[in-house]
Amino acid sequence: MEAEGCRYQFRVALLGDAAVGKTSLLRSYVAGAPGAPEPEPEPEPTVGAECYRRALQLRAGPRVKLQLWDTAGHERFRCITRSFYRNVVGVLLVFDVTNRKSFEHIQDWHQEVMATQGPDKVIFLLVGHKSDLQSTRCVSAQEAEELAASLGMAFVETSVKNNCNVDLAFDTLADAIQQALQQGDIKLEEGWGGVRLIHKTQIPRSPSRKQHSGPCQC
């Protein structure tokens, strides 16, 4: 999808334990944009962090560019991951509905971000991934909804395999960021990369060229 006409850039990170499906979730979302490549079927574990982008027309707001960071869940990469916290405005906290430990660790991930950013700068969304694996599920939707409510965030279940709610998760987070920005709960700040106002002079375009969603040099 072209980034032409985007008013803001929102920097968003996906956090959660290793192997919960963050990479496949992100690549599936990016590949849902017209002209974007298909996601790899078996992505390798993320090394540190990778950046992707997708432009999005908000339901009740302007067109925005999402800068999406896929972070590694392995402990040896945690120091790298933490460096992104202070410059994100949105976080998808992802757990695997078939892996109870990944669900129990959600509060740890949430606390890490809160300790770095504070309570007023980040919009969270809880994502229960791999909802297609009902036979091996060990975390109920009710449990997840209760945790999300206790942490003050919304909850969405997703499945890349069934193409279930992938777009909804990212779109819901983006809409919530825009609403917070409109209401003044989140403010543009010099030197903070969470939300950036995009000026037309910063996006040169040639009539014969198009920009597609995909990995970016962020």
UniProtKB/Swiss-Prot annotation:
Top-tier EC class: hydrolase
Pfam families recorded: Ras
InterPro entries per the UniProt record, alphabetical: P-loop_NTPase, Rab_GTPases_membrane_traffic, Small_GTP-bd, Small_GTPase
Record-linked PANTHER family: DRAB11-RELATED
Cofactor annotation: Mg(2+)
Disulfide links within the chain: none
Gene name of the encoded protein: RAB42
Protein name stated in the entry: Ras-related protein Rab-42
Keywords of the record: GTP-binding, Hydrolase, Lipoprotein, Magnesium, Membrane, Metal-binding, Nucleotide-binding, Prenylation
Annotated binding of Mg(2+), by residue: T23, T46, D70
Keyword Cell cycle: no
Tagged with keyword rRNA processing: no
Gene3D superfamilies registered for this protein in UniProt: P-loop containing nucleotide triphosphate hydrolases
Domain of life of the native organism: Eukaryota
Entry binding sites for GTP: A19, G21, K22, T23, T46, G73, K130, D132, V160, K161
Cellular component annotations (GO), alphabetically ordered: plasma membrane
Lipidated positions per record (S-geranylgeranyl cysteine): C216, C218
Membrane topology type: Lipid-anchor
Main subcellular location of this protein, as a coarse class: membrane
Any GO MF annotation of the entry: GTP binding
Organism name: Homo sapiens (Human)
Primary role: The small GTPases Rab are key regulators of intracellular membrane trafficking, from the formation of transport vesicles to their fusion with membranes. Rabs cycle between an inactive GDP-bound form and an active GTP-bound form that is able to recruit to membranes different sets of downstream effectors directly responsible for vesicle formation, movement, tethering and fusion. The physiological function of RAB42 remains undefined.
Annotated control of activity: Regulated by guanine nucleotide exchange factors (GEFs) which promote the exchange of bound GDP for free GTP. Regulated by GTPase activating proteins (GAPs) which increase the GTP hydrolysis activity. Inhibited by GDP dissociation inhibitors (GDIs).
Recorded family membership: Belongs to the small GTPase superfamily. Rab family.
Subcellular location: Membrane
